[in-house]
């Protein structure tokens, strides 16, 4: 495929615009970024006059990294005389296939408090009621997809209920790679009060995780949203159609294969509504 110089320039400008919009820094130092984000979490909690951070722990590197940053931040606040705690929340849908990884994550985080809430009864009840009242609107082939979104939103309902009980804020785990691909559920895992991993590529999240002492096996774990009951532990990259290395290279301004670039741009455009606030009339 041969492109004109004008078309190539347009694509480079588009890539640069996306990098700027998602806040990816041109350089990265794991130690400096760790400190900056811990300070960010500590300062924000202190200025809100709230007393806790709440975060769902899945067993993946994103929630593990965000949680370790948060636990460090609240510990620092307590050292300076402030009331602060970190509440880790396990939110399995029945029995989680990789529960052992979630427990390893908790052991690494050492949260002030751990709460476990099974979302299966609530998620199943909601799906059943919606299907009972609007079943003809549901394509049979997409029921599992809809249930996956219900799971994500039910998890956020639980986290906000818990945050209200402890005067806390909910932490989200969204980072630049997921934001680029729109790989989150609106008002589910996409809902949060604070995003300590914002502006990071996946490899940079892993670099911070390594710097703060996360278990290597969880750093290297194949990422999965694990929302589909019919495809448990489906890798993120399978859903993307591109690899995290390709996504990260794109976000770091590097050249990637044309098919991968087009896939990324297509998903970025299609998911624009997910990254926007609710639209209003002018």
Provide a role label for each language-model segment.
Residues 109, 129-133, 187, 212, ...:
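Alpha-helix boundary/capping residues
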Residues 85, 111, 144-147, 173-241:
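Catalytic subdomain that performs nucleotidyl-dependent activation
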Residues 1-55, 61, 65-69, 190, ...:
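Peripheral terminal appendages
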Residues 11-180:
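ATP-dependent adenylation/nucleotidyltransferase module used to activate substrates
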Residues 67, 71, 103, 160, ...:
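Predominant activation on well-ordered alpha-helical scaffold segments within soluble catalytic domains
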Residues 92, 196, 215, 223, ...:
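Proline-rich low-complexity regions
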């Amino acid at each position: 495929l041969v492109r004109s110089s004008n078309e190539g320039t347009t694509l480079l400008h588009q890539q640069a615009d996306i990098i700027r919009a998602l806040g990816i820094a041109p350089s990265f130092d794991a130690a400096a970024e760790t400190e900056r984000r811990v300070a960010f979490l500590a300062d924000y909690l202190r200025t809100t006059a709230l007393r806790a951070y709440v975060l769902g722990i899945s067993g993946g590197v994103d929630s593990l990294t965000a949680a370790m940053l948060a636990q460090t931040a609240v510990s620092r606040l307590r050292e300076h005389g402030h009331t602060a705690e970190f509440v880790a929340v396990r939110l399995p849908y029945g029995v989680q296939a990789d529960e052992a990884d979630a427990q390893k994550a908790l052991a690494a985080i050492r949260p002030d408090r751990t709460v476990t809430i099974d979302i299966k009864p609530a998620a199943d009840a909601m799906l059943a009621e919606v299907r009972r009242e609007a079943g003809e609107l549901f394509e049979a082939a997409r029921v599992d997809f809809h249930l996956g979104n219900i799971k994500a939103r039910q998890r956020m309902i639980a986290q906000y209920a818990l945050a209200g009980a402890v005067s806390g804020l909910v932490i989200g785990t969204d980072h630049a790679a997921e934001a680029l691909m729109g790989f989150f559920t609106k008002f589910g895992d996409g809902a949060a009060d604070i995003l300590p991993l914002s502006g990071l590529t996946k490899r940079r999240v892993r670099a911070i995780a390594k710097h703060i002492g996360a278990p290597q096996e969880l750093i290297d774990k194949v990422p999965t949203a694990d929302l589909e009951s019919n495809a448990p532990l489906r890798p993120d990259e399978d859903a993307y159609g591109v690899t995290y290395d390709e996504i990260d290279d794109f976000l770091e301004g590097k050249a990637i294969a044309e098919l991968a670039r087009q896939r990324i741009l297509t998903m970025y455009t299609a998911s624009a509504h997910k990254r926007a606030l609710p639209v209003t009339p002018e």
